[in-house]
Amino acid sequence: MVGMRLSEMLIDQGYEVAHLSRNPDKVSSYKTFKWNVKENHIDDNAITYADYIINLAGASVAEEKWTEERKKEILQSRVDSINLLYNCLQKTEHHVKGFISASAIGIYGNSGDQLMSEESTYADDFLAQVCKAWENAAWQMRDLHLRTVIFRLGIVLSNKGGA
């Protein structure tokens, strides 16, 4: 949901947008490159095509019961996707200037009505641990001299779906 709306907004601003997908042959309005995080595969052309990478990848936290297996998938889908991008950027000649990654306000835990900022204390529950690992994976992009930005999403609501 976030990715599609962001893509629309970027197109409206005159940017070219491409997506990564496990099913690039699916009909899409956007140029689409194949990747499969579980198989550690990404089309190298995706990296050479990009000026900036916006990473929103991650298994939904709301779709299934949190079994130990599902929790592992929630964590790994976020961290492994960034690690795959990092490894590909490291070995491929590219002109990527920046890396933007999602994270979540879950890093703060249940804070009630308390106003939170980047300096606020992080929680230590499962979602906070996921967010910390997710952000740590993203920050490694600075080692490649890429401007790195992380934004923390809250609950997403839309007339097309959401929490």
Regions found by a protein language model. Give the residues of each.
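Conserved beta-loop-beta element that borders a ligand/cofactor-binding pocket
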Residues: S103, N136-N159
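NAD(P)H-binding glycine-rich loop region in Rossmannoid oxidoreductase-like domains
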Residues: K34-S81
